[in-house]
Amino acid sequence: MRLTGASPDGWGSISADRQFLKALREYCDRTGTQLIYDEVVTGFRLGLGGAKGYFVKPDLTVLGKIIGGGLPIGAICGRRDVMEHMDHTKYSGMEYFYHGGSFAGNPITLAAGLATINVLEHSPVYEHIAKLGNMARQDMSRIFEDADFPAQAVGVGSLFAIHLTNKKPLKDISDFISDLAQSKRRFNYLLENGIVILIPEMMHGAASYAHKEKDINYLTTCVENVKSRS
């Protein structure tokens, strides 16, 4: 089993290297190992196909969050020949796999999830949030470059992150975990001004369908103000 994320939001919104994913796929094929993607964050955020539509297809994918339409949910999906081992009409007992629980297949959650998929399929959600994500990254990058400030904005789709370093490319957590005290001061300033982003060590966030361009403009204004705080 190899569990990874193709576009790991929890790793500072730095996409996994394509050659790394390709090498993982080749290794798993060679050894008979299942390649599993953790798409609890990226699944349905980067597209209905998740991040697996960007790079290398996994054998299994773990999903959560938005697929429940705001209600608690978790899901596993994957290749038919792998998933059919959960079918007890074909494989009796617990010979291969057992799955069950008090909330498995909760009808209210599944109905909310289907309604969410319908909205994602028939509304310009992905175009809108990707546009805002690109806008946020480009505007913040311009601010940093114009001020010759050692920081960069990265991400994909609607995801964005701020890293207080000029080092490129970012490949390891040590590349962007910098002065924590400085990061906390800037994080707190943004929070005090209504900008909620995740953890000062890796300041990252995401645009939603409810956000507008004016919200991104406000974000970048706050970032421009915070860059000078030490």
Give the ranges of each region predicted by the language model:
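Conserved N-terminal phosphate-binding loop of PLP-dependent enzymes in the Aspartate aminotransferase
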Residues: 1-230
